[in-house]
Amino acid sequence: MLFNSFVFLLAFPIIFAAYYLCPIKWRSWLLLLISYAVYMNWVPVYALILLWVTLTTYTGARYISRNSPKNKLKMTVAGILTLLPLLFFKYYNFINNIVYDILTPLHLRIEINTMHWAVPIGISFFSFQAYGYLADVYYRRIDCERNLRDYALFISFFPQIASGPISKAKDLLPQIKSLKTFDADKATQGLQLLLWGLFLKVVLADRLGLYVDSIYDNYTYQTGFSLFVASLCYSLQIYGDFAGYSLMAIGVAKVLGFDLINNFNRPYFATSITDFWHRWHISLSIWLRDYVYIPLGGSRCSKLRTYWNIFATFLVSGIWHGANWTFIIWGIIHGVAQIAEKALRLQKYEGSSKIGRA
């Protein structure tokens, strides 16, 4: 059930009324039920994957929170089990094709069937959110959550599960534990964000998409100027699509009394690649900084090691965006560009989510 669908426009007023008419002590249960119902609206059986990730990280964090010399092993096992569904559903065919391409010139043939299952909606987002919670418990940034209902809602919270933003436990769990009464001003702000997000997605992105697709589908017959204009329009299209959906998620959450992180901050006004990543998909940039870049050593090491840490972080970013060489190369280009900026001291920092500092 996408926010720009007719089904959601019919369902949300009912969700809104049911949520605020429900006694506060039962609202978490109601919201959890709604979140799973919304998720099962896509492919019902995939709710089992959501449940797997929830129970794996909930149980893993409980074990990790016990001070033990084997905590690193526990974190490794729990982390692998958490990311296993993501690796299987999103990257199985990609890895399968790589193995095939390597073995074929060697005249070695291993027949491995291609998987034809659809990738579960939002698996990249809720898997990263769950892993982030696990890592925060491991690094003693937060205490483990003992209330399974609250934790399950943190992972499955329906406004953000399909396309983010990726929330941290320290930001969202306290809000789940202290649900508020109806706030008219906050709800008004939420509706404004929802409508602006709808405009960006439906009016801007979807309309531009029609033009961009018509050019790219017949690119061999297009002039250089047409391809240039289509590329500019595509930049606006992906911004409207992603930022619009993020704004809708933030707006829906705000109507229900929750505050989610702002995911975009005028990215095309950035003054450098580094600044761009402080403004574009901010919640992912923060996640990569906290759970990839800093654990690798961040900038508190030699220059060469720091450059490698930046490169590895953006390589992970490219892989996360899609199981395709295009995304991997895209991640490498951004990583190399940011390394060049750092080496030549061309960075201009604006914002708080800095990859390149730790």
Regions found by a protein language model. Give the residues of each.
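Membrane-embedded transmembrane alpha-helical bundles that form the catalytic cores
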Residues: M1-R357
